[in-house]
Amino acid sequence: MAEKTYPMTLEEKEKLEKELEELKLVRRPEVVERIKIARSYGDLSENSEYEAAKDEQAFVEGQISSLETKIRYAEIVNSDAVAKDEVAIGKTVTIQEVGESEEEVYIIVGSAGADAFAGKVSNESPIGQALIGKKTGDTATVETPVGSYDVKILKVEKTV
């Protein structure tokens, strides 16, 4: 069975690698130490510190596993390989909802790099899916769970 690939920029992959290193070299040892301390309190059946530390350990190990998978199956996308005015991962897109005057700017990233607060939208998000492959001047229909709307692509540029 073919594994899912995770399209991302080189910068996104490097960020994931740093996050993984932090989890393995800092967070994991901290949790192991908390488990040791909690064990020293005696009876584990009513030891809330032990339970909390074990829960945190499971969470950290899950994050490590997820990051290792994303890094292992990362597909580095070179935005220079697509047309200058074509929307792709690694591009910054300025759009305007049809019938509205406000412009919105988004950076298209792989799912691992999505951060709505920083204006980074995943290629798998409704807006990302609608914009990928379109060019400056095109209109795209964004399909959301609550309905659809059209946006006009005003500008596409390489993200710095």
UniProtKB/Swiss-Prot annotation:
Family the UniProt entry places it in: Belongs to the GreA/GreB family.
Transmembrane stretches, start-end: none
Entry protein name: Transcription elongation factor GreA
GO MF, one example: DNA binding
Role according to the record: Necessary for efficient RNA polymerase transcription elongation past template-encoded arresting sites. The arresting sites in DNA have the property of trapping a certain fraction of elongating RNA polymerases that pass through, resulting in locked ternary complexes. Cleavage of the nascent transcript by cleavage factors such as GreA or GreB allows the resumption of elongation from the new 3'terminus. GreA releases sequences of 2 to 3 nucleotides.
Ranges in a coiled coil: 1-72
UniProt-listed PROSITE patterns: GREAB_1, GREAB_2
Keywords attached to this entry: Coiled coil, DNA-binding, Transcription, Transcription regulation
One of the GO BP terms on file: regulation of DNA-templated transcription elongation
Species, as recorded: Streptococcus sanguinis (strain SK36)
Pfam families in the cross-refs: GreA_GreB (PF01272), GreA_GreB_N (PF03449)
InterPro entries in the record: GreA/GreB_C_sf (IPR036953), TF_GreA/GreB_CS (IPR018151), Tscrpt_elong_fac_GreA (IPR006359), Tscrpt_elong_fac_GreA/B (IPR028624), Tscrpt_elong_fac_GreA/B_C (IPR001437), Tscrpt_elong_fac_GreA/B_fam (IPR023459), Tscrpt_elong_fac_GreA/B_N (IPR022691), Tscrpt_elong_fac_GreA/B_N_sf (IPR036805)
Gene3D superfamilies listed in its UniProt record: Transcription elongation factor, GreA/GreB, C-terminal domain, Transcription elongation factor, GreA/GreB, N-terminal domain
